[in-house]
Regions:
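Conserved hydrophobic beta-strand positions in leucine-rich repeat
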Residues: 52-57, 78-80, 99-103, 121-126, ...
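Leucine-rich solenoid repeat scaffolds
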Residues: 155-210
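The feature encodes a structural signal of leucine-rich repeats
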Residues: 42, 65-67, 88-91, 111-114, ...
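Leucine-rich repeat
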Residues: 48, 70-74, 93-97, 116-121, ...
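Bacterial Sec-dependent N-terminal signal peptides
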Residues: 1-27
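LRR N-terminal entry segment and analogous cap-like coil->beta motifs
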Residues: 31-34, 42-90, 95-100
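Sec-dependent signal peptide cleavage junction
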Residues: 19-45, 200-210
Length: 210
């Protein structure tokens, strides 16, 4: 298995991850897809046609997604970044055509089990939240190729993640306080996955003194 030990190589990390899921190439999902990225739920609902991309930069006076969003069942890409989101609605499971879900830089404490219904999901970005664990249902995401989870206080990963061994190509666990033993366990579960991690002994020492 290929494994990257990344300590302070910010330029290398930025380059590799931008290739993986920061690319500018626009994927056309249907003949009527003109590449439009909507930036508010209100505008998307007024579009009068299928909406494939929604990118939210703020949620006014909210800590969860508006229920109206889940009417957009044709969504393929959903980005909710830096919105101070504290809770992800169970109704996220209704967006079954999602291929890309970016929840970077929020305040999520957990992900709902219903996320396992996103059977077409390819990329899951959950970096820079407050997640301590991932739901067992993540093992149901059999199309998932990339999980970006860096910067979370994850103390445990579900054993079901091993169900992704045939599709998962990148698992970003940088700045996560897992022990060396736990990383080795991930290698056994996901032998074909590139696991990105920070080889910093303080992470293990912190666990030993808890």
């Amino acid at each position: 298995m290929k494994k990257l030990v990344l300590i302070g190589l910010a330029f290398l990390i930025t380059t590799s991850l931008s290739i993986l899921y920061g690319q500018k190439t626009v994927v056309r999902y249907a003949p009527d897809d003109d590449g439009t990225v909507y930036t508010s739920v209100e505008a998307a609902l007024k579009a009068g046609k299928a909406v494939y991309r929604l990118k939210l930069a703020k949620l006014a006076n909210r800590d969860s997604l508006p229920e109206e969003l889940f009417q957009l069942t044709e969504l393929r890409e959903l980005t909710v970044k830096g919105c101070r989101l504290c809770r992800l609605n169970q109704n996220i499971g209704k967006l079954t055509k999602l291929q890309y879900l970016n929840l970077d830089h929020n305040k999520l404490l957990r992900l709902p089990e219903s996320i396992g219904r996103l059977s077409d999901l390819r990329t899951l970005v959950i970096s820079r939240n407050i997640l301590e664990e991932l739901p067992e249902s993540i093992g149901s995401l059999r199309q998932l190729a990339t999980i970006d989870a860096w910067g979370n206080p994850l103390y445990v990963l579900p054993h079901s993640i091993g169900e992704l061994r045939k599709t998962l190509r990148v698992l970003d666990l940088r700045q996560i306080p897992l022990t060396k033993w736990e990383y080795e366990a991930m290698e056994q579960l996901l032998p074909e996955t590139d696991i990105l991690f920070t080889d910093i002994c303080e992470c293990e020492n912190r666990r030993d003194h808890d």
